[in-house]
């Protein structure tokens, strides 16, 4: 089999397309169960603001919060594989939990209220029920409609679980992320409900549709961010300044991955375990 080489290297990365044994991720040395969360925080002795990541997935938002200076003490998600990944990479509590369950919400808020002041509750409740992409497929055929109903309708009210944690824990601020479609015709009632409920809980609320490319990320998909700051506890939220006004000037996908060698699939007997990295080709990398 002939494999084209990258113009930057004569040594393309070859991937043997065979699924190996499942990788078992070891927990972070400083991970703890939900029962021990208050003691973990007490022993933490950190000056960093404490944050909670709801619907944390594998930990993308947790990583961003960590880089922003927060101490993420708790990440919650319903998927065991996501929590295993989160628990591997982050200290504190990575808790598998069904946030639609009142019992589980009570358990989480009870522990958090023993942890001292929480500065931020952040997270992105599942967006599939509000995504236009799902709605287009919803009308394709009966099988897709059934799949949509079974997988997504039960997730539609999880934003309420997010706000329940905010109301019970009273963090200084919250940050909710979702698709922009939640503020569009058809779902505006939910969007207005989020704003109204947060304001009744004592938060000043601001929402903005953010285009990632404007902030230096090579991605076109916009996301809606709803930021709330507790009146009397902290100053109003300030949105970040945009880096790019025009898409043509923004970073592109090629700017992000052009330093990577070509990835070749299929069965290759003489495949390589490693690849020599040529180094970054631009400032983004």
Tell me what each language-model feature is.
Residues 219-221:
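Short, solvent-exposed loop/turn segments at the edges of secondary structure
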Residues 97, 180, 203-214:
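Conserved S-adenosyl-L-methionine
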Residues 20-170, 180-184, 188-192:
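Core alpha/beta nucleotide-donor-binding catalytic domains of modification enzymes
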Residues 190-205:
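Conserved Class I S-adenosyl-L-methionine
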Residues 172-176:
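Conserved beta-strand signature within the Rossmann-like core of class I S-adenosyl-L-methionine
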Residues 185-186, 214-217:
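Flexible, glycine-rich beta-alpha linker
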Residues 1-70, 197-200, 223-285:
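S-adenosyl-L-methionine-dependent DNA methyltransferase catalytic core
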Residues 124, 177, 211, 227:
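Alpha/beta-hydrolase-fold catalytic nucleophile elbow
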